[in-house]
């Protein structure tokens, strides 16, 4: 059995969810969900979350793109829905503002040694987030990303500080 099957980008979501629900009932899959990487589709995803028909959602959330904090993340917490974050680096755009800059000294408080870890820890420290899935084809980037698993996670006040710090770099 599969652990998780998701309807990608909400393509024909109602039809596919019917199949996935049956597969879940049959024990072929443990969890079912839906994904989108488009903020314009958050309302559709929210509707699915409210329907009680899915166990997981996957959407974009990062230090730049924080729209999900308004409705999706609180709703996931409220409903006990797992959250997978895609595009945590916004296709590398989060690095544009910080190229050539060192991470702030205070990032050492939560064991960050590079910007990738800073950005990933911002994401995975949100109480609603189950995991983030940064895409990379480079081993050195994967190793940097894995470093975000080490040490403590930022608390809500530190998360605010991280977002403010990043926003002020613009």
Mark where each language-model region is.
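Structured C-terminal cap/extension of enzyme domains
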Residues: 51-56, 71-170
């Amino acid at each position: 059995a599969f652990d998780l099957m998701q309807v990608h980008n909400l393509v024909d979501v109602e039809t596919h969810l019917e199949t996935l629900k049956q597969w879940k009932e049959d024990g072929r899959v443990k969890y079912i969900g839906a994904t989108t990487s488009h903020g314009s589709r958050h309302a559709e995803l929210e509707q699915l979350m409210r329907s009680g028909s899915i166990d997981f959602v996957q959407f974009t959330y990062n230090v730049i793109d924080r729209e999900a904090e308004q409705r999706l993340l609180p709703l996931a917490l409220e409903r006990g829905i797992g959250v997978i974050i895609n595009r945590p680096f916004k296709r590398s755009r989060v690095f544009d503002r910080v190229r050539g800059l060192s991470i702030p000294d205070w990032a050492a408080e939560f064991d960050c040694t590079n910007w990738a870890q800073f950005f990933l820890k911002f994401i995975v420290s949100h109480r609603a987030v189950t995991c983030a899935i940064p895409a990379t084809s480079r081993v050195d980037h994967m190793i940097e990303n894995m470093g975000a698993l080490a040490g403590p996670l930022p608390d809500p006040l530190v998360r605010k500080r991280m977002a403010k710090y990043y926003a002020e770099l613009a």
